[in-house]
Every structure is written in C-alpha cells, then in structure tokens.
A protein has these predicted regions:
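A conserved acidic, glycine/proline-rich C-terminal tail/linker
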Residues: 25-30, 37, 247-284
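N-terminal non-catalytic cap/leader segment that marks the start of a structured domain
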Residues: 20-129, 288-292, 307
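Short, charged beta-turn/beta-strand-edge "cap" motif at the junction between a beta-strand
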Residues: 46-48, 125-127, 168-170, 272-276, ...
Length: 307
C-alpha cells in the first residue's frame, strides 16, 4: 500500500485572465444515479489547501458557501465525515441562488486529495498483501510538470481510474464494494525504464498525478465511464471501463480480507491492457500526457526535461 506524500509547500495562487478553473472539468455531466452530482477539487487559498466544488466550470469555495464553522475545509476532512448532514449541507449550498457569490477568481487547482494510502497494482492478479508496503510517492496535480528521474532512459505510462473509500471496509464482497465508495478520480502513473526496458531507480522516484477532481458516486456510473489517453495530441488508448470497474471492485474486496480499510484509502487500476512491446507507451522528456474521462475532466501533465 503506497502512502502518498504531500509536497512540502504549495505556491500561492497566481493571476490569470479570468476566473475559470484551469484544468478541463465538465460543468455538468447529468445525474446518472438520481442525485445531484458533486465534482470536488482542492485549490490554493493563500498557500493553504482548500475544498472547492465545480459549478458551471468554475470553482466555488464550498466551506464559505455552506457557511458553517464546523464544515470541513479540506477534501480529506470531507471524505472522513462524508455522510448524512455534511453531504446534505454541501448539496444544499450548491443549489442556492447566492452560491455564485462564492466563486473563486483565478483559482489554481491542486491535487484534489492526498489519499490515506493508494494501492496501484498493474492488474488484479498482481495484488498481494504487501504490495507497495512502506513506500512513499509524491503526488502532483493537474497542469503540473512531472520531474524527469535522472536514471531513466524513458518513462512507461499507466493511465488509471481510482476509487476513494468513504466508509470503513473489512471482509466485503465484490458486490457490496460500490456502496462504500466516496467517489472517483483519475491517476497517471509512471515507471522509469532503462534503455533495455527494465525498471530503474526506486518506485518513489516519479510522482503520481491525481485529478482534476473527485466526482461523487451519485454523479458517476463507473461501468459506463469512457476514458481516453493522449500523448502530444495523438490518441494512445480509449475505451469504456465496463469489466474494469468490476475488477476495481474486486481489487478492493481482496484488499479488505482480514483487515480494515479506512475512509480515504484509494485504489487505482488501469482500464487498458499493458503492452511492453508498444512503442507508443515510451514517453520522452517534454511529452504532454492527457487522461480524460466523462464526468471527471482531463488530467493533463507535461514530462519535464532531463536533469
């Protein structure tokens, strides 16, 4: 289980041409499961992480919109208390006419959350109780550059969808996993390779990109989710999650055997088969990588130069 590491500090919000959020996040994507959907982000408020929600393509400060001093100020805290009145208060605030008074101008979006832990197997079959144990990976957000590891000849790219738990979970069946999930987000995972294609360095050498938002389960049907991955504008892979969603549920069920999974734990799985012989998976410095999903938006990152 990977323990994501937050950056030591965050740059302050910068000026921009308008108040629209920089990453591409849909203003609305329908109400798939009958409840008002929420697309939750974290933005930089004077150097601190702050909970926001997307409304008409803009960031709304959710704690200010709710107006209660006990309402969570971060997405991590929101996940920990994401049942009953907290969810109701958030939805009610976003539905009020005066919610536009709380739109954040020139919002700079950060990684939406730092999961308590993040399991990143290459496939459900590769899951083991100790996979990733004790390792730390730095987390970056949308529109941030990926620092190039000094030992890498090239990077392998693994686009993934992550489910964030909203309830404590133990010994759960696959069929019961969906109701325990808080929401979904996108993950771009990278593996440093040498010239012969073998992994090099440590697994914490390349940060994980997460974002651009977390969509709550009431606004997202994972089995119907359509994803597309691009490199420098050219399509790398696309497809519907379909069976991959059930594989993700199975991954969580397997991880819950004999242990307690906590709120805020996240599990990510790639919907596209890995092919080591695919030259398009070899990424080089300067490549622009985009992972898009209906209802979530586009996670966009550029690979940095060689050090």
């Amino acid at each position: 289980m990977v323990s994501p590491r937050a950056p030591a500090e965050h740059a302050r919000a910068h000026d921009g041409p308008d108040s629209r959020v920089q990453p591409e996040i849909p203003a609305a994507a329908g109400r798939m499961l009958g409840l008002p959907e929420m697309r939750l982000v974290t933005y930089d408020r004077r150097g601190h992480r702050r909970l926001g929600a997307i409304l008409d393509g803009r960031v709304v400060d959710l704690p200010d919109a709710v107006g209660h001093p006990a309402f969570p100020a971060t997405l991590e805290a929101f996940v920990q208390s994401s049942r009953g009145t907290v969810l109701d208060a958030a939805r009610a605030a976003l539905a009020r006419p005066d919610v536009k008074d709380h739109v954040v101008k020139r919002a700079r979006v950060l990684p939406p959350l730092f999961p308590r832990s993040l399991l990143l197997p290459t496939s459900p079959e590769s899951l083991s109780p100790t996979e990733g144990s004790g390792l730390e990976r730095r987390v970056i957000g949308p529109e941030q550059d990926v620092p190039w590891p000094s030992e890498a000849a090239w990077l392998d790219y693994e686009p993934k969808v992550a489910a964030v738990l909203g309830l404590e979970t133990t010994d759960v069946d696959t069929e019961a996993v969906a109701e325990r999930i808080f929401g979904y987000t996108l993950v771009s995972d990278w593996v440093a390779k040498d010239a012969s294609g073998d992994p090099v360095g440590t697994s914490d050498g390349v940060p994980i990109a997460i974002g651009p938002c977390v969509v709550t389960i009431d606004g997202c049907d994972p089995q119907a989710m359509f994803l597309q991955a691009k490199v420098d504008g050219s399509e790398l892979a696309k497809g519907n999650l379909n069976g991959s969603a059930r594989s993700l549920f199975g991954l969580i069920a397997a991880a819950s055997r004999g242990t307690v999974l906590e709120r805020g734990d996240a599990f990510a799985l790639g919907p596209f088969p890995a092919r080591d012989d695919d030259p398009n998976r070899r990424l080089w410095p300067g490549a622009l990588v985009e992972l898009a999903a209906e209802g979530i938006g586009t996670l966009r990152n550029r690979l940095g130069p060689r050090p």
